[in-house]
Amino acid sequence: MATHLLKALLQAGHEVVSVNSRTLEELPLEADVYILSVKDSALQDVIRNAVKGREGQLFVHTAGSMSMDLFKGCCARYGVLYPMQTFSLDREVNFREIPLFIEASDAATFQQIRALADSVSQHVYELSTADRRYLHLAAVFACNFTNHCYALAADVLAQKGLPFDVMLPLIDETARKVHELHPTDAQTGPAVRGDQNVMDAQSALLDDRLATIYMLMSESIKDEKERYDQLRLKEDTGHRV
């Protein structure tokens, strides 16, 4: 993610005075903002070391699930700038279209972070640490778990010598539909239809690990459909009263 953010900052006309990926020894003592984009497990140590001698400067981190308060007691001005997107080094992204979620230690600092965020994205939102944790959790379901299902599908196809490419039109249409429909309304397949014979036959083709995943996912689809239908019925009943 850091590489893509760096490109976006440069394209927006910002002067990047230093990039430090391995060591903080060459980190300048003065800059308008220090952006810490490291893995979550390293963030606390990086903050502690980066802030030394720069306690009056503005620091932000980019982690979706980590608290802004990691900076508390280390520096005076701090915040979060979280781009919600999946990043891979060899894939270009349009940063202007990526939603950025920000928060800050105080109102003046918020305005500085907001200006920085607005310069690289058209979609900037204020969000607290508590709410951002749920946003990041939702992203894990929508992106990480979904991609894992692609990997499982690729394994199933490979058993019969079929290329993963045959899934791409299906994957693309599934993604397009949720631009217009609620995900539950867009759900198709044997689980949402309650076709138990098909589910039993398909799970029998799988090893124990995949069969367990298959049945858990199928039960979740059925439960979600039932919950969604009940909620919609209550809403419709309320409108008729």
Where are these regions (language model features)?
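Hydrophobic/small residue at the entry helix of a nucleotide-binding pocket
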Residues: M1
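Internal alpha-helical scaffold of NAD(P)-dependent oxidoreductase catalytic cores
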Residues: L5, A12-E15, E92-H179, D236
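Rossmann-like NAD(P)(H) cofactor-binding subdomain of soluble oxidoreductases
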Residues: L5-L10, H14, R22-E92
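Short phosphate-engaging motifs
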Residues: A42-L43, S67, A108-T109, H148-C149, ...
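Glycine-rich beta-alpha junction loops
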Residues: G64-M66, Q85, D106, I171-A175, ...
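NAD(P)-dependent Rossmann-like dehydrogenase/reductase catalytic/cofactor-binding core
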Residues: D165-V241
